[in-house]
């Protein structure tokens, strides 16, 4: 398999630059304003002129303005960015029917039946980059490798506005040398846990008993890392986008008090159910944004549809789990529903 990964460079801020060329060359910061007080909220993304000063996604707006008071600060306009993203994704579909849209600014293409080798893949990547730049004035970074994970790693190495191939020999080298924190899907907290076990490189996961690894980071992540370290990872491109509906709300103050958080959580559920229309979810995730803007979530999938009453009770259990497992205060709380079935009016399809 040959996978081509496309990552839109500093996407939200770049769209703002395209729409307003006078912003080019200036530090631009796109923000999610929470409305708690003036400048409350967090940075969604920043262009490279801002990043070189330390302004990056996730930091509080107040902190960003201390670092870079003269930058251009703009509110996030998700609908505008989504329109541009949709057009670019349609361009990508011209190059492969097998496309997995990972997010608003990332996509994987299986180009195995389009090219014969990595040299042709590289040329196709250049063609895609030039086409997107010509049509949308947006620069992207392209990573190419034998699977999705190493294609993403290749793009991370080539940012911004670059292109890189990680061939099979370089994959073997990276398995030996790649820092565990640089593996996609392994966040800082998980990386810290692994390093306490002596796992500093990807290959180190092979030197520890699987049950011990599973006990530390969970079965799914343990299997994921082992398959990568053995050079056996081959998850296919999934052409269907996982659809979910949810809502996250900002609380008046950071808290770890269950009773204080519950009304905000229930509000998120109520607003999410309003958007479900006739779809019934089988999966629920409670999503918490912590005081340091990290994201923690816990979820459950049911064999049948979830009624609103079940969503209320299950969400409290999931919230309790988050509070038990994480000592940080919660800043924002929300819920995400997925794995939908169509409503047919029969009670037996609910898990109550």
From Swiss-Prot:
Top enzyme category: transferase
Active site: 106
Residues annotated as domain UmuC: 3-187
BP GO terms, sorted: DNA-templated DNA replication; error-prone translesion synthesis
Annotated catalysed reactions: DNA(n) + a 2'-deoxyribonucleoside 5'-triphosphate = DNA(n+1) + diphosphate
Keyword annotations of the record: Cytoplasm, DNA damage, DNA repair, DNA replication, DNA-binding, DNA-directed DNA polymerase, Magnesium, Metal-binding, Mutator protein, Nucleotidyltransferase, Transferase
Keyword Magnesium found: yes
Transmembrane domains' residue ranges: none
Temperature note: Highly active from 35 to 95 degrees Celsius. Thermostable.
Highest taxon in the source lineage: Archaea
Binding site for Mg(2+): 7, 105
One Gene Ontology CC term in the entry: cytoplasm
Note describing how the cofactor binds: Binds 2 magnesium ions per subunit.
Cofactor requirement: Mg(2+)
Function: Poorly processive, error-prone DNA polymerase involved in untargeted mutagenesis. Copies undamaged DNA at stalled replication forks, which arise in vivo from mismatched or misaligned primer ends. These misaligned primers can be extended by PolIV. Exhibits no 3'-5' exonuclease (proofreading) activity. It is involved in translesional synthesis.
Assembly behavior: Monomer. Interacts with the PCNA heterotrimer via PCNA1.
Family: Belongs to the DNA polymerase type-Y family.
Domain notes: The catalytic core consists of fingers, palm and thumb subdomains, but the fingers and thumb subdomains are much smaller than in high-fidelity polymerases; residues from five sequence motifs of the Y-family cluster around an active site cleft that can accommodate DNA and nucleotide substrates with relaxed geometric constraints, with consequently higher rates of misincorporation and low processivity.
Record protein name field: DNA polymerase IV
Organism: Saccharolobus solfataricus (strain ATCC 35092 / DSM 1617 / JCM 11322 / P2) (Sulfolobus solfataricus)
């Amino acid at each position: 398999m040959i996978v081509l990964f496309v990552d839109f460079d500093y996407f939200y801020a770049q769209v703002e630059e395209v729409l307003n060329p006078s912003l080019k060359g200036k530090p631009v910061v796109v923000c999610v304003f929470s409305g708690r007080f003036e400048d409350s909220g967090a940075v969604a993304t920043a262009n490279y002129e801002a990043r070189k000063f330390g302004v990056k996604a996730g930091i509080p707006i107040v902190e960003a303005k201390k670092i870079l008071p003269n930058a251009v600060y703009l509110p996030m306009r998700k609908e505008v960015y989504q329109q541009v993203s949709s057009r670019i994704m349609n361009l990508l579909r011209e190059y492969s029917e097998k496309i997995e849209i990972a997010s608003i600014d990332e996509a994987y293409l299986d180009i195995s039946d389009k090219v014969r080798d990595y040299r042709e893949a590289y040329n196709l990547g250049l063609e895609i980059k030039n086409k997107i730049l010509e049509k949308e004035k947006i620069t992207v970074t392209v990573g190419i490798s034998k699977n999705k994970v190493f294609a993403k790693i290749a793009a991370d190495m080539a940012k911004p506005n670059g292109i890189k191939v990680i061939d099979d020999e370089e994959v073997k080298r990276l398995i030996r040398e790649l820092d565990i924190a640089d593996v996609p899907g392994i966040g800082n907290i998980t990386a810290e846990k692994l390093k306490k076990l002596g796992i500093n490189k990807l290959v180190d996961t092979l030197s520890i008993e699987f049950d011990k690894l599973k006990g530390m980071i969970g079965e799914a992540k343990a299997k994921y890392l082992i398959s990568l370290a053995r050079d056996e990872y081959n998850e296919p491109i999934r052409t269907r986008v996982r659809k979910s509906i949810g809502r996250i709300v900002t609380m008046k103050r950071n808290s770890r008090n269950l009773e204080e958080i519950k009304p905000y959580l229930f509000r998120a559920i109520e607003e999410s159910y309003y958007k479900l229309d006739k779809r019934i979810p089988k999966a629920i995730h409670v999503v918490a944004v912590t005081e340091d803007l990290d994201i923690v979530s816990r979820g459950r999938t049911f064999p049948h549809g979830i009624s609103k009453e079940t969503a209320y009770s299950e969400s409290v259990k999931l919230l309790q789990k988050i509070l038990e497992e994480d000592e940080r205060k919660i800043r924002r709380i929300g819920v995400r529903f997925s794995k939908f079935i169509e409503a047919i009016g029969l009670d037996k399809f609910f898990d109550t």
